[in-house]
Amino acid sequence: MLPAVSAHLVIRLGGKPMRLFAGDADEVGEFISHSVIGGVRDAAYLKDSSDFAPTVGVVFRPGAAGAFLGVPTDSFAGSHTPLDAFWGQAEVENLRSELAEAPALERRIEILEHALLRRLPRIRGVDPAIVQAALLLERRPVGKVATALDWSHRHLIARFSEAVGLSPKRYARLVRFGRVLLRLERQPETGLAEIAQDAGYADQAHFNRDFRSFSGISPGEYRKAGGTGCHVPEQNRPENSRR
């Protein structure tokens, strides 16, 4: 699995708990839970996708996950944490049972949405300044974003990192990486040099280096493996290892 700028909630309604691997040499892995919060990550991770089960989940907007969980987003960044660590075991098991008994996907989405909305009276909303910063960082350098918000560079880094779980610079790089992934998937005939130039990389080497730092593979290898979004099939990726 490749990194992205958003935290996510996943609830498996059957099968085994989510299993992650420490690396290619790890043949056992670690079972996390059926209900998991995936924090914002800036590196790829290895997940077992062989045990298919019905699943429902949420991808949070930047900064929103921490609001719904009642803790700073940076406190669970870079990790996968059982949902009951935030909501309590009884509440999570009741929610999972209700989701499993629902007759259709649309109903499951409604149930999960209502579960999140019920928490709104107990949480603080996402700081509008953080929302604005996230939008500005998609197109502007960090220094100009700080100026636009009338914040110091240091204050922007501290506030944004706590709310989103990534530094502003790292967030901006991951946003660009996400745009590149989308284009690689949707425009298979477009050359890598053109994609690199349009994304604002200095040259092809810069593009390859940045892409590999997040994914562990080159853009060409990703395209050859048939990657879709943040997913690279195990059997198709280089060295045939899990990702």
Residue ranges: model-predicted function:
Residues 1-153, 163-168, 182-187, 191-202, ...:
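Alpha-helical bundle regulatory/interaction domains
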Residues 160, 172, 210-212, 223:
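DNA major-groove recognition helix of helix-turn-helix
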